[in-house]
């Protein structure tokens, strides 16, 4: 296994200009994470490669998250390089939260959507509950601008939390196209200039039939375009955009990719909520490591799905997601030494090398 770890270290070193000690840690962290499928440090410490005692491994994990100044730009660029997808990108913005004891963990995350899945590129971790602020959202977008440029955004997708005058002005100022969902009772003007709940404009569209209003409406002091459809049971999907779009709901469906990401980071992959970390800075670093681990697993699954035709179940979907397919392969490689396949290992390393 030593030679295999070295090949992983060498590949990481070729893509991340870190010192050797940090690269060695990252390689062992990835292997341990794929083995135990949890971010719980105590569990990771039990399978950390090397001759060190479990207690020493645990302290090493803590020390990395506490002291190492992680170069997030390099990791974000590596994630995008690993995906092999070029911009402009469809982005999905969302928030997830949970509690560690009495402490709130709140993560605002921006992801690139590719093949129906979100891939994390920038995020903010907050120690307080509740919705994100406009300033937090603007900061997140500015981080993306610094990395890739505003021109690399094809469309920004977000749920009902992400609306407001200052926020929309910011997006329009940077010429960012967006599709944001509105609450159905948001007050808008109808054709006669009367203020009515937004859902009334789409009350007669029919079930799951989309209507795009041809003229802009004045909202939050801005000229914005509305579209909507009735979902049944009193629910409406109402979208707001800075310009007329023929089929906005098809674009908005891509927002589901970030929900897929959160599921993979949590219960269907790395069990993020198992962490006992409470400090935002340490959680920030942990998320960066998970971004790389998640993307590598997806790319491995993508390769496997291409060489081995997946049988679809009755509902029309494969039994495993591409991410889970890749995660299972990596898990088997790092845990089942009796059946270790060096050919497969070399292949997954080549995928990580982006060559």
Language model regions located:
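Active-site-proximal, Lys/Arg-enriched surface segment
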Residues: 58-116
């Amino acid at each position: 296994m030593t030679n295999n770890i070295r090949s992983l270290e060498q590949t990481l070193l070729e893509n991340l200009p870190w010192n050797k000690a940090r690269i060695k840690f990252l390689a062992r962290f990835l292997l341990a994470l794929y083995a135990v499928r949890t971010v719980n440090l105590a569990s990771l410490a039990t399978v950390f490669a090397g001759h060190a005692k479990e207690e020493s491994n645990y302290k090493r994990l803590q020390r990395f998250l506490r002291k190492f100044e992680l170069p997030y730009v390099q990791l974000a660029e590596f994630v995008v390089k690993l995906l092999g997808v070029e911009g402009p990108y469809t982005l999905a913005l969302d928030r997830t939260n949970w509690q560690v004891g009495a402490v709130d963990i709140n993560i605002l995350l921006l992801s690139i959507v590719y093949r129906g899945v979100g891939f994390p590129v920038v995020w903010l971790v907050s120690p307080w509950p509740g919705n994100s602020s406009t300033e937090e959202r603007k900061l997140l977008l500015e981080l993306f601008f610094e990395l890739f440029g505003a021109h690399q955004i094809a469309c920004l997708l977000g749920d009902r939390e992400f609306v407001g005058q200052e926020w929309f002005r910011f997006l329009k100022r940077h010429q960012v196209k967006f599709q944001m969902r509105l609450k159905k009772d948001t007050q808008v003007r109808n054709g006669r200039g009367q203020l009515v709940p937004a859902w009334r404009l789409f009350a007669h569209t029919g079930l799951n039939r989309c209507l795009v209003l041809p003229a802009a409406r004045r909202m939050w002091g801005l000229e914005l375009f509305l579209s909507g459809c009735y979902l049944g049971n009193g629910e409406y999907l109402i979208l707001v955009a800075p310009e007329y779009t023929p089929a906005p709901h098809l674009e908005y469906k891509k927002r589901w990719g970030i929900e897929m990401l959160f599921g993979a980071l949590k219960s269907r992959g790395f069990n993020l909520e198992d962490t006992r970390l409470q400090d935002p800075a340490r959680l920030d670093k942990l998320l960066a490591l998970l971004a790389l681990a998640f993307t590598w697993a997806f790319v491995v699954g993508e390769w496997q799905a291409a060489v081995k035709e997946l049988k679809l179940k009755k509902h029309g979907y494969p039994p495993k997601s591409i991410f889970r397919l890749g995660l299972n392969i990596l898990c088997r490689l790092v845990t089942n030494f009796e059946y270790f396949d060096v050919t497969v290992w070399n292949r997954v390393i080549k995928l990580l090398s982006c060559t």
